[in-house]
């Protein structure tokens, strides 16, 4: 096992209680000190003594961090290793222990439901899993404090491959409705995080037809509006005034690469394979613009690779794969996962520059050829 992998805590033997490093400090003061330490160091700190272990494995430390404003962004990644969706593993991106750079460290999460054909949304320190092939109305929550799954109120409709997004404390879900029904008032529904209730949202766009009602949709949140795409059509929904506008998909040229884009600080980014370029969408000019200097160092690495972009606390994280040849030289048998950390900066002229701060392999062990990203996103813990 690599030094950067994190085995379950139950496999680690806690040291015999010895004279405490800070013997007489009250618990609240210890919590205040530990809350200022990066969450990524908690697993190591929990081995120092039993008292640290007790505090760092309880929910109290995270409640203290949240109330005191010491939360930080942690990037969670879920990879699926089969077409059935039954074999998937969770990882967290963190800095290496003994060298510079990053690694995807495995997270021990038991009884994890299949995420295949579901929509995943991060809300604070929680990750919502919505819909799916089996029990399509179900909603589950991964508590990133305890890494335990909880159940949430079910949706009103069963949905297979829906799309969801968070807007002003509410989760909006569209599409994926089961065939054999058509009801524009149920194509979209919204979950209020405060009241924990689901309500339907009537779609008033003439773009919604019987055929598109069952299509898989993709949602993007830009400028407080929900951009919803399916097939070759799209609509824009503004929840503030409950208005719907039509959108031509060719206008944004997103038919093929929609699944690999991300929104960072209200700007939409996408990777264009033919040009091996990262671009951002200028909503005022309604055109794509290149991320200046963003891909210069990475061109030779991402050619013929599968690329995924994600927001990581205002920076862009780019994952891509690299095939590993078999020993006999007759093809490939494994893949390696690589990652780049890209800082973003907007100039006075309105252009956006990208600076590659680091790139390298992030999984110490190779992964199967057949894999897919089920989820990549930041949570606050």
Swiss-Prot record:
Q: Give the F-box domain ranges.
A: 19-65
Q: Which Pfam families match?
A: F-box (PF00646), Kelch_FKB95 (PF25210)
Per UniProt, the keywords (alphabetical) are: Kelch repeat, Repeat
Matching InterPro entries = F-box-like_dom_sf (IPR036047), F-box/kelch-repeat_ARATH (IPR050354), F-box_dom (IPR001810), Kelch-typ_b-propeller (IPR015915)
Kelch repeat segments: 126-169, 171-218, 220-266, 269-314
The UniProt record lists the keyword Repeat = yes
Cytoplasm listed as a keyword: no
Q: Which top-rank group of organisms is this from?
A: Eukaryota
PANTHER family per record: F-BOX/KELCH-REPEAT PROTEIN SKIP4 (PTHR24414), GALACTOSE OXIDASE_KELCH REPEAT SUPERFAMILY PROTEIN (PTHR24414:SF184)
According to UniProt, the name of this protein is: Putative F-box/kelch-repeat protein At1g60570
């Amino acid at each position: 096992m690599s030094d950067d992998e994190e085995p379950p805590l139950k496999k680690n033997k806690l040291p015999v209680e010895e004279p405490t490093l800070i013997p007489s400090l009250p618990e609240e003061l210890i919590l205040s000190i530990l809350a200022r330490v990066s969450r990524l160091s908690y697993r190591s700190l929990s081995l120092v003594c039993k008292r640290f272990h007790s505090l760092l494995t309880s929910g109290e430390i995270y409640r203290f961090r949240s109330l005191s404003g010491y939360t930080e962004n942690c990037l969670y990644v879920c990879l699926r290793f089969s077409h059935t969706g039954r074999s998937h593993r969770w990882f967290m991106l963190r800095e290496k222990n003994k060298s510079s750079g990053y690694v995807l460290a495995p997270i021990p999460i038991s009884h994890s439901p299949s995420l295949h054909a579901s929509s995943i949304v991060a809300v604070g320190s929680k990750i919502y899993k919505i819909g799916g092939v089996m029990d399509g109305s179900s909603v589950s929550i991964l508590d990133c404090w305890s890494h335990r799954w909880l159940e949430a109120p079910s949706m009103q409709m069963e949905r297979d491959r829906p799309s969801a997004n968070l807007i002003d404390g509410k989760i909006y879900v569209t599409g994926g409705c089961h065939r054999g029904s058509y009801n524009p008032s149920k194509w979209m529904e919204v979950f209020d995080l405060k009241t924990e209730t689901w309500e339907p949202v009537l779609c008033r766009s003439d773009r919604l037809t019987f055929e598109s009602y069952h299509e898989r949709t993709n949602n993007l949140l830009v400028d407080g509006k929900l951009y919803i795409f399916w097939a070759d059509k799209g609509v824009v929904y503004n929840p503030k005034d409950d208005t719907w506008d039509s959108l031509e998909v060719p206008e944004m040229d997103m038919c093929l690469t929609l699944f690999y884009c991300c929104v960072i600080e209200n700007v939409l980014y996408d990777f264009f394979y033919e040009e091996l370029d990262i671009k951002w969408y200028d909503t005022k000019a309604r055109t794509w613009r290149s991320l200046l200097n963003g891909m210069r160092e990475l061109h030779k690495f991402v050619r013929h690779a599968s690329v995924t972009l994600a927001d990581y606390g205002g920076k862009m994280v780019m994952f891509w794969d690299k095939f590993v040849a078999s020993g006999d030289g007759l093809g490939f048998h494994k893949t390696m996962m690589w990652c780049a950390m890209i800082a973003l900066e907007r100039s006075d002229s309105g252009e956006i520059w990208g600076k590659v701060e680091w790139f390298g392999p992030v999984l110490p062990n190779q992964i199967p050829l057949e894999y897919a990203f089920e989820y990549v996103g930041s949570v606050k813990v």
